[in-house]
């Protein structure tokens, strides 16, 4: 299956691209996608965004699937399906 991954904020600058299409196995989850991205982009990605061993995004990053923040779904265990739109972004907060 294929999902479209868009990058916003600093991650877009770091990776040097706006979006890409990723090929995943049927039944893949957000965690599987992040592991693939970690393998593809290596140390820079792991250091900034996601550490596979920790199984969590680093502080300040979020994943949105089809308009919903993954925290409102099933977190990293959220299943993906063909045609999903995934956004990896820095989170901004204020006070």
Task: Give each language-model segment a name.
Residues 1-94:
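Ubiquitin-like/PB1-type beta-grasp interaction modules and other compact soluble beta-rich domains
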């Amino acid at each position: 299956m294929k999902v479209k991954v868009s990058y916003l904020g600093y991650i877009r600058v770091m990776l040097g691209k706006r979006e890409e299409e990723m090929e995943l196995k049927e039944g893949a989850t957000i965690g599987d996608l992040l592991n693939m991205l970690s393998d593809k982009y290596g140390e820079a990605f792991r250091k900034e965004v996601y550490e596979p061993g920790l199984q969590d995004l680093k502080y300040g990053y979020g994943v949105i699937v089809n308009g919903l923040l993954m925290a409102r779904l099933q977190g990293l265990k959220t299943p993906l399906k063909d045609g999903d739109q995934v956004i990896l972004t820095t989170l901004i907060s204020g006070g």
